From Swiss-Prot:
It comes from the Eukaryota. It is an enzyme of class 3 (hydrolase). Residues 19-331 are annotated as: Histone deacetylase. GO terms for molecular function: histone deacetylase activity; histone deacetylase activity, hydrolytic mechanism; transcription coactivator activity; transcription corepressor activity. This is Histone deacetylase RPD3. Present with 3850 molecules/cell in log phase SD medium. Residues 422-433 have a biased composition (Basic and acidic residues). The gene is RPD3. InterPro entries: HDAC_PDAC, His_deacetylse, His_deacetylse_1, His_deacetylse_dom, His_deacetylse_dom_sf, Ureohydrolase_dom_sf. It comes from Saccharomyces cerevisiae (strain ATCC 204508 / S288c). Changing residue 327 to A: Strongly reduces HDAC activity. Keywords: Chromatin regulator, Cytoplasm, Hydrolase, Nucleus, Phosphoprotein, Repressor, Transcription, Transcription regulation. Gene3D superfamilies: Histone deacetylase domain (3.40.800.20). Belongs to the histone deacetylase family. HD type 1 subfamily. The lineage of its organism: Eukaryota, Fungi, Dikarya, Ascomycota, Saccharomycotina. Residues 388-433 are annotated as: Disordered.
Length: 433
């Protein structure tokens, strides 16, 4: 039997859905490498950025280089001992830290590489500063593709993740927002984020992932939270080969119900690209449009939103998809013909902004999905009334998260004005040039 993926409707945007987007990117992020043969390649963030710039999306949004997260900021979630270890360990002195390496699970999947701590601080800084800008009403959507490292634990690296930037970003959002919703569309379960907020009703976590003999082995249907957090963790365990139409038929009703009943005042969306068809480590069959539909759907609720990266191990497909999704966040449906960019040869032989589904068999039967949905909605019945939060004095903003002054930005160049000032200029929709 040959399985044919159902064609997906073209994605559309409404003029009324225009949002102010703050995009965080650090040019150094692509310089870091986990090591030869390791599937995680930070270079994909640089490839996505190159596409985003060459499509002209820089005219539509403000671009920032976030301050790297400090030790003090990282320790809002992680233990001092663990962060201290990350800041001191290098490939040269690894022998001295043998005991700690075992304790903190740093080794095979999470190797020590040159610049490890700096890489973590870039990832954490983007998510924390994005959250701070949302808190102050400076933007409606914050984007940090260097973030999304959802497996990292309080004092342990896991699944290519060392610093859990998502948890740090959510902690920042909780200073202003009574309820935060976290949605995860990575093929792997968002275990680190779920674990961090498993006992609270102030954060609802919702993860759509492959379950069954697959890393990290958590995220089954009956994991719903404990104590005050009971029913505030939602897990949607899926099987191999899920296609666009099937994914949409699960994603949209679940998110709609959560939005209706939980009424979050901010949402964090982890856009792991390993749920795309043809991923080196994934086993789903989503096209670029199927993945992007999730972003567009969450955006349509008009709630302050932070978008972070995550997994994704076929670099050309991750870059294409994140670029297309950045367009949607800016209310633009990008043209399929790729503009010339410095990584153009990666996108052959078609050179199109497209990730097509394969003829992979969809193991997710309607009966299985009905059972999953019935279970989830039964649990959500218990969250019908959004939990309230006691009024508290909001602590002063961290000085490190203040706006960058132009004086401290990069030196002025030949065109007059600084690059920083031009990055903040957003072109009006009616401009002709």
């Amino acid at each position: 039997m040959v399985y044919e993926a159902t064609p997906f409707d073209p994605i559309t945007v409404k003029p009324s859905d225009k949002r102010r987007v703050a995009y965080f990117y650090d040019a150094d992020v692509g310089n870091y490498a986990y090591g030869a043969g390791h599937p995680m390649k930070p270079h994909r963030i640089r490839m996505a950025h190159s596409l985003i710039m060459n499509y002209g999306l820089y005219k539509k949004m403000e671009i920032y280089r976030a301050k790297p997260a400090t030790k003090q900021e990282m320790c809002q979630f992680h233990t001092d001992e663990y962060i201290d270890f990350l800041s001191r360990v290098t490939p040269d002195n690894l022998e001295m830290f043998k005991r700690e390496s075992v304790k903190f699970n740093v080794g095979d999947d999470c190797p020590v590489f040159d610049g490890l701590y700096e890489y973590c601080s870039i990832s954490g800084g983007g998510s924390m500063e994005g959250a701070a800008r949302l808190n102050r009403g400076k933007c409606d959507v914050a984007v940090n593709y260097a973030g999304g490292l959802h497996h990292a634990k309080k004092s342990e690296a896991s699944g290519f993740c060392y610093l859990n930037d998502i948890v740090l970003g959510i902690i920042e959002l909780l200073r202003y927002h009574p309820r935060v919703l976290y949605i995860d569309i990575d093929v792997h379960h968002g275990d680190g984020v779920e674990e961090a907020f498993y006992t609270t009703d102030r954060v609802m976590t919702c993860s759509f992932h492959k379950y069954g003999e697959f890393f990290p082995g958590t995220g089954e249907l009956r994991d719903i939270g404990v104590g005050a957090g009971k029913n505030y963790a939602v897990n949607v365990p899926l099987r191999d080969g899920i296609d666009d139409a099937t994914y949409r038929s699960v994603f949209e009703p679940v998110i709609k119900k959560i939005m209706e009943w939980y009424q979050p005042s901010a949402v964090v969306l982890q856009c792991g690209g390993d749920s795309l068809s043809g991923d080196r480590l994934g086993c789903f069959n989503l096209s670029m449009e199927g993945h992007a539909n999730c972003v567009n759907y969450v955006k349509s609720f008009g709630i302050p939103m932070m978008v972070v990266g995550g997994g994704g191990y076929t670099m050309r497909n991750v870059a294409r998809t994140w670029c297309f999704e950045t367009g949607l966040l800016n209310n633009v449906v990008l043209d399929k013909d790729l503009p010339y960019n410095e990584y153009y040869e990666y996108y052959g032989p078609d050179y199109k902004l497209s990730v097509r589904p394969s003829n992979m068999f969809n193991v997710n039967t309607p009966e299985y999905l009905d059972k999953v949905m019935t279970n989830i909605f039964a649990n959500l019945e218990n969250t019908k009334y959004a939990p309230s939060v006691q009024l508290n004095h909001t602590p002063r903003d961290a000085e490190d998260l203040g706006d960058v002054e132009e004086d401290s930005a990069e030196a002025k160049d030949t065109k007059g004005g600084s690059q920083y000032a031009r990055d903040l200029h957003v072109e009006h929709d009616n401009e002709f040039y």
